[in-house]
Amino acid sequence: MSYELNRKLAAPREPLPTTAEIDQVTADIIRGAFETVCFESATYLGRAASSPIINQSNERNAAIVDAHGRLAMGAIGTPHLTFVNQMETRWGLMNQERYDWGPGDVFLANDPDHGGGHLPDYNVYGPVYDEKGELICIQTLQAHQGDTGGKDPGGFTLEATDVFTEGVIYPCLKLVHRGQLRMDVFDFVVRNNRFATFAGDIAAMIGGVQHAVKMLEDLLCKWGSDVVKAAINHSIEHTEKRMRDEISKWPDGTYEGTVFIDHDTAGTKDIKVHVACTVDDGQLTVDLTGTDDRQDLVGVWNTFANSRSYVMTQVITHLDPTIVRNEGMFNAVEIVIPEGCIAQPPPNKPAALGSFHPACEITEAVCVALSQVAPERAQPQLYKIGMPNAVIGFD
C-alpha cells in the first residue's frame, strides 16, 4: 500500500512472447471472439444476479487481461470499470505464487490501495491456462455491490476519514480452488454484507467468470496458445497506432481545464481539479498537477486506479469510437497524477465517495481541455450530481 505500488501497477508491460506470425484477419477474428466472451460473461452476470443494481442497472463490466497484466479486451459494461479491472488483477498477477494460482481458481478483490476503485466495486477474476499449464490470460468481471459491511449501509459514509469505516477490504481472496468452491471463504464474504441478495450476486459473478474461462480455454484449443498470444499483441499494437494517428491530427500544444467541487462533505469549499493535456506529435500527456492536495479534506478522495480510468474514459470520447478498448490506449497516452492529491491519495484514505467527486470533475476537466482541440466531440458532464443528495438523501 504505497505510491511505489501504484507506480508498479501502472508501469508499461512487454508484449507476450510468441513465435507465431499472424495476419490482420485472423487477429480480428480472435479479437471478436474475445469481445463475445466478455459480452457473454457480463450478460451471464446481468441475468443471474439477485440485486437490481446489477440485473437492472447493469453496473458491471467484463474484461480480459493477458498474462503480463495488459488489458487485452475491455468490451462490455460501465465504461470507467473497463480500465479498472486490469489494475486490481495486476496485483494478484504480481503475487500469483503467494496466492497459489492454478487452473480452476477464482479470486475476489476490492482493495482501493491495491489497484481497485471504491470498495463496492467487487472484481472477480479467474486465470486461464493452456493445455501445457501456461498462463495465457485472466477473465475479469467487476460489479458494484449494494453493501460492503461498513459503518453505513451501502458503504458510503459522509464523515469517514479512513477506508476501514467504509467496509471490508479484500486485496486478493480465493473463492474457488481448482474448481471447488471454498465454502468457508464464501460464507465469510457473504456474512460481511447486510443484503441477503449479495450471496446470489457473488455466485453469479463466479459463474460468469467460470463460463468465460471455459470459452477462452476452448479458444486456446482451437487456435493454439501462440496464435492467441500473437493476436493479443497485434490488437494492442493496432489500437496504439490508431490512437496515435487520431492524436496526431490535433495541433501540438498544451490545453488546460480547471473544475471545482463546490465543497467536501465537511463543508470545505472550492476543491480544485486541474488538468493539462499536452499534444506532441501523436503522443498525449494528461497531467493532473495542480489538483487539490489538502490532507484534511473529507469524502473527496478518488483512488489512483479510478482516477486513471476516468481520465482514459473521457479521452477516448474525443477519438474514433471504433478503436478497440485495450492496453494500446495507455501506450499512446501518458497519465500523470501527483502523489498525495485527491486523485492519488495516501494509503487508507476513504474511497467510496470518490467515484462521484472528484471522479466526475476529473472527466469534466479533461473534457474542458480537449474541447479546445476536438470541440465537435466534447460533451457535457451529466454525472455531476450532488453527492449527499445522491448517496444519503439529505437536502
Where are these regions (language model features)?
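Glycine/proline-enriched, intrinsically flexible loops and inter-domain linkers
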Residues: S2-P103, L108-E131, L135-T285, T289-D395
